[in-house]
Amino acid sequence: TYVFWGGREGTETDLSKNAADAIKRNREAMNFLCEYVLDQGYDLKFALEAKPNEPRGDIYNPTTGHMLAFIETLDHPEMVGVNPEVAHEHMAGINFMHGVAQAWEAGKLFHIDLNDQYPGRYDQDLRFGSRDIKAAFYLVKFLEDVGYEGMRHFDAHAYRTEDYEGVKDFARGCISTYLVLKEKAAQFNADKEIQALLAEINADDGSMSQYFGAYSADKARALKEQPFDRSEISSKGLQYERLDQLTID
């Protein structure tokens, strides 16, 4: 898998170029590259990495969601996926795990960059898990639960204060954090109290199952006639506070 980060593909003033034409040029380039790979008989795929800004003032296709939509317009979308990066999505204030889940569900999670980041700031590339350990846990748990087998790439760097030994501490820290969170994810999945609570939270009485699946006019008609007691529904707490605290505990 070859990763593309289009850090050059952006603008500081939207009067400098037509944004739609810029997307078309990106599409033409990716189509050309895919055809070249096929013509040469290479066993190669591409992963597109999104970033909202830096070094350009604004970068086209700034998030993983934008990239997923763009990929579906290509001539060979099966050859192109995404490489989500923690820091880049957090720069845009987005829930990273949700973007990863969307990419995975679409069959487009070809690669992933792990680091950490304060939201809304320049690209910091902090040690994985060093800022938001809970978000890092959610991510690791998702990757392990779905059986992701691709690369786990630590696109990060040590604090500017570190010497050579500090850089080695940083590298070991990235790997250690992932492995610790992997172990904690297994512990979460095996915890009887947590699993009992999840079963209660997600319990389904089957009352809506008749509406599942494909559309039909009969289903739509019945759904519009389905009574809902809003007071009864809203009176039952969902116990998310307890679940969240058990996760921390």
Each language-model region and where it sits:
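Arginine residue identity/basic-tract feature
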Residues: 8, 25-27, 56, 121, ...
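C-terminal extensions of enzymes
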Residues: 164-249
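A cross-domain feature marking catalytic cores of carbohydrate-active enzymes
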Residues: 3-6, 48-52, 82-88, 113-116, ...
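Active-site acidic/histidine proton-transfer and metal-coordination neighborhood
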Residues: 1-81, 203-213, 230-249
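Short non-domain terminal segments
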Residues: 146, 152, 209-213
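Generic hydrophobic/packing signal
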Residues: 9, 36-38, 52, 74, ...
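Gly/Pro-rich active-site loop or hairpin
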Residues: 17-20, 57-68, 78-81, 88-149, ...
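Short, hydrophobic/amphipathic alpha-helical packing segments
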Residues: 26-31, 136-137, 175
